[in-house]
Structures are given as structure tokens and as C-alpha cells.
Amino acid sequence: MLRLLLLPLLLATFPAGAGEHPPAHAIEAAAHAEREYDAAQVELLAELVRFRTVHEPGVANAEHPEFRAFVTQLRERAERFGFDFTDYGGIVVIGLGDAKDRLGIITHGDVQPADPAKWQRSPFELDAESEPGRLIARGAEDDKAPIATALHAMKAIRDLGLPLKRRIELIVALTEESDWAPFREALTRYTPPEMNIAIDSQYPVVVAEKGFGSLRVTFAADAVPGDAPAVMSYAGGAFLSQVPEDASLVIDGVDNALLARLDERAARNDKVAWDFETSGDTLTVRATGRAAHSSTPQNGINALAHLATLFAGEPLRDSAASRALDFVNTLIGTGIHGELFGDIAYAHPFMGPLTVNLSTARTTDAGVELAINLRAPAGKTPVQLERELRDAIAAWADARKLPLPVIETALTEAYLPAQPEQVAPLLAVFRHYTGQRDAKPISIGGGTNARLMPNAVNFGPSMPGVPYTGHSEHEFITREQMTLNLRMYTAMLAWLAADVR
């Protein structure tokens, strides 16, 4: 509670226009980095995205051949640049300098899956031609461009021979997208720096992160005999932290009247691209929305949710899939703040509202499983939020005289660190290089490895007010943004790590 009360004071500490400019040596270092390494960082990004560093179930990332090759590439580049390199399994650490105090720069080299059919070229090949000015690839924004940029920012610091009061350690996690346990295990053998900056989010400076939550609800029921149409399958989505772009539904027993009603509803909903395919009295409906990171569901169009609304109010034969559709229409809808889901909706004055994303639906022999991603601000404990989720689901089942579906939850606390000393210099760097004099600290819905480290905040790589493309099927970073990031990351390192008076 104390940290909640201190947040207004934190914001008041950084009024619009406040903060000095970066010192001269930081500005000079940034200029050197841009002059010498702006093109080189893009070349390194092209090398890094070629590695398909996607988690494969049943195989530890640190042991996977693609990850091993990726780590080897980082080691070779670090040694070429004159840095030391240590492999801790779940993380690798690339270091510059031998000062006792240390500055940690946190990033990650693993990426989310990508559907090749949705990319003009292979998602694991840097495409700088299809859309001039954009560097398109899986990992371009999240988080391989920041790795390439940080390495060249460190190289610029080394070139200039700046004396260091803090050793710089670039910490590259290998499991940020799938499992944080290997990072936690590495921290039993690696003592983290006391000052840390993650480069896995957005600007100006991220000082708070919403809690991450998953809710899985499984409906098990055999289709009962009857004359009503029977939903045979309801499926879509790729992974938990993505707004689903694709969804499909197969329904038997469709007559002309139902088909006409569905056609009319689809025509009224132009947010989604619809495809209807009939075979006898069987109808397959496909919906195409827009993928986005599930921490920013407002940037996406949820194909699963919109597909469910097409069948709202229709009498359907009881089945696992029909129960799932009713659940979605009753408790989720096409909103993103949980207003329909019992009492779960709430907001925090700094961190913003709870968001709810229906991420995936899977139809199996056991039934239909819905996976829902929640991003929860401060203001409710995980225990309270879980109770409200379960109460709402129980009320839904009771009202329909249905057995309670299988419910699995995993909820974490919001991240609200005390005010770290690096916030003011980072804001000054951002204000200097962007001209945004009113920039202040922000909160995000995403969850990053920053919360595993002491005194950690996020600084980029994405600009405020610009849709984030990580986790989407159209991930890119602009060429202009990479240059700007190189300036700001170099200035940041020179200011916080160099001993220049």
C-alpha cells in the first residue's frame, strides 16, 4: 500500500520539462556510436533473427540447437568487441569493465512462434525491402534489435576509452517468453547488479508493470441428441500473450434461416474478415481479426471473441463447444476490461484498468479449453482476483444448471518498485533526443524480466503512442527507431556507467 501512495509523489518528482540534458561526454559518445555503428547494428540484427529461438516443448531452451547457435554467435561477437562472456544456462552475461559497482542491461533472445503464411518473407529473415523504412522479422522489436543496439552502444563506450565507475553487463535471457524459472535459477549463481535497466518495453521510462494472469477453463460435454444445430468445434489463437488473429467454428444442422441470420450479422461487423463455407448442412465459419500483444489488446481485433458473437442468442444443441460460446458471449464479449465478468473489472489511477484477452480456444477429445490472459494493475491481490473469477464462473454455471467447468488459474502481483535513481537520467536522455519535454514515467500491461532484478526499470525500445508489433504476425522495428535507440542507449551507458567529471 505504501508504494501505491508514493506513486503520485514519483510522478511529481519529474514535472514536464524538468531534468538536465545529458552531460557532454554522453552526447559525444552517442554521436560516435551513430557515426560508426548505425549500419553495423542492422547487420547484426539480420544475423540474430536467422536463429529460430522459439521454445520447443520438452526441450530446454539452453540445450536446443538453435539457442546454442545463437549463444555461440553472441559469444563470438562479444569477444570480437573486447567484452567478456559468461554462460549461466538460462541467461548469458556480456561484460565491459571491472568496476565493483555494476549496471545491468536486461534483454532476451527467445521469441514467440510465427506463422510463415502470414509473412511476405520468412519471419526468420530480415526483410528490409517489402516496406521501405521497416525492418521486418520475428524478434525485430522483441527483442533482438535491442540486443544488437546495446552491443554497439557498449562498443562505442569501449572505443572512447571512457573510465567506468560501473561495469556494464548485458544480460540476455533465453526463456523470457516461455518460462522464467531458468532465469531465477541462474540468479542463484549470478549476483545481479544493483542498478538495472531492461530494454524490453517502451519509452519514456517504465516504472511499473501489471501483474500477469492466466485463466484456463475447460468444458467437457458430449453433444446430446436433438434437432438444434450442433457446434462441432470452436478453435483459434496461437499463444497466451497474443490477441488471436484467426478463429474457426464448425456447426452441423444449419438451415437457410440460420445461414441468413449469420450472413446478416457478419455483414454488420466489418471489423473482422469473414469466410463461410458450406457442405450440405455443415457450415464452417472463419474469422480473421488482427493480432497484437495481449498486454495491449486495444491494438488488436480478437477473432475468437467476434466469432462467438455471431452465434449469440442462437439455440444450439448442448455440447462443450456450445457451452464455450455461451461462456464467451456472457462473461467476455468483445470488450477488453472484464466488465461482463462478474466483479473483476477495476482500474488503478496510474497503472490503468485490468485487461482481459481471450487468447486461444482448443477443441480436443476432452472438450473445449479456453485460455484467457489477464493483465492486472495494483489494487487487488491475486487471491481476491481469483476468488472473483471463480465466483463469476460458478454463477454462470449455476444459472444454466451446468456442472462447473475445470478451472486453472495462475496470477502474479503487479510490479511497483521503489523509485530507482536512474529514472531521472533516463528521462533526461529521452527528452533530449526526442524533444518530448513533457515525458514522464509510465506503467505498462506487459511483464518483463525487470521484475526479477533489483532496482529495475524499462527504457525502450518502442516509442509511446506507436502500436507495439512484438508478438504480432507483422513484427518490425523502423530503421529510424534503431538509430534513435542507438543514440539513447549509448548516452544512457555513458551517463550512468562512465566516471567523467
Place the predicted regions along the sequence by residue.
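Sec/Tat signal peptide C-region and signal peptidase I cleavage site
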Residues: 14-18
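Acidic/histidine-rich catalytic neighborhood of metal-dependent amide-processing enzymes
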Residues: 143-222, 256, 263, 271, ...
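An extended, acidic, His-containing surface patch that forms the Zn2+-binding/catalytic region
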Residues: 290-291, 295-367, 371, 375-391, ...
